[in-house]
Each structure stands twice: as structure tokens, then as C-alpha cells.
Amino acid sequence: YGIHGVETLYTIMGTGCESVNRMSSDRGDVVTGRWKDGRIGTFRGITKGPQIYGGTAYTPKGSVAVGGYQGYKTLLEQILKFFRTGIPPISKEETIEIFTFMKASNMSKEQNGKIITLEEAYQKGWKDARKLIKACNKK
């Protein structure tokens, strides 16, 4: 699954991921994304062993600890702000790219770690959505 870890990755990296591959074992998964500007971002989901939330951002000036669980205060503040203003804290484009990143990750796992472009995953997602809509309309 990994939505929270992927959201943290996107908070650091921003949009612009082009391709993804995912390596898996019985202990967990490592997903690697390549961004348009050449940066590489990784997400690791651990299924056996310590459940640690957070990460490390590597910059030209050094490394910085990121993420970590600080409670729900910040999330609730953003939810309240959204209900007051009607303006979502994250753009539609970023939200779609995050879900496309996860779709590409799953496709890569199904294909033994093959590199999947986000465009390929996006098109597959649209195709799958149209099938679901068609099936729902038949009921």
C-alpha cells in the first residue's frame, strides 16, 4: 500500500516522476522513481521487521531526516483550512501523479521489477476505470 510514505516522498521531490520500478521480497519492497530532472527518489515498505516511519533526504549540502510521525495535528489543521476555504492543500495534478506512481509500482511488481513509465501506468488506469464504469452501468 504505502500511501503515506509515497506522500512523504512527493512532499520532498515534487511532481515530475517519469518512471518507476519495484523490487520485492518477503521482507518488503523498494520502489525507485526517476524524475524528469534526473533526481532519483525511493520508497521502502517493510513488511517484516521494525515498522519505522520517516526517511532521509540527500542534498548537495548533506542529508536531512524527514517524515516521522508527529501526530494528527498538522493533518487536522489542513483539513479545517480546506473546509474553511474550499482550496485543497495539494493540487489535483499531484494527487493524480501520486496514485499513478503507486499504479506503476504495482505494475512493476507484477512484471518482476520492470521499469514502468508513469504515462503507461496512467493509460492503464484510465482503461481499467472505463471497464469498471461500463460494468457498473450494466447493473
Features from the language model and the residues they span:
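A general structural signal for well-ordered alpha-helical segments in protein cores
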Residues: 5-6, 72, 76, 102
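Rossmann-like dinucleotide-binding domain that binds NAD(P)(H)
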Residues: 1-50, 93-100
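Short secondary-structure transition/capping segments
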Residues: 12-16, 37, 63-75, 111-120, ...
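Generic hydrophobic alpha-helical segments
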Residues: 9, 78-82, 105
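C-terminal helix-rich "cap/oligomerization" subdomain common to oxidoreductases
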Residues: 84-139
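Aromatic-acidic/polar surface patches that form glycan- and anion
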Residues: 1-2, 68, 72, 88-94
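C-terminal substrate-binding/catalytic lobe of Rossmann-fold NAD(P)-dependent oxidoreductases
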Residues: 29-77
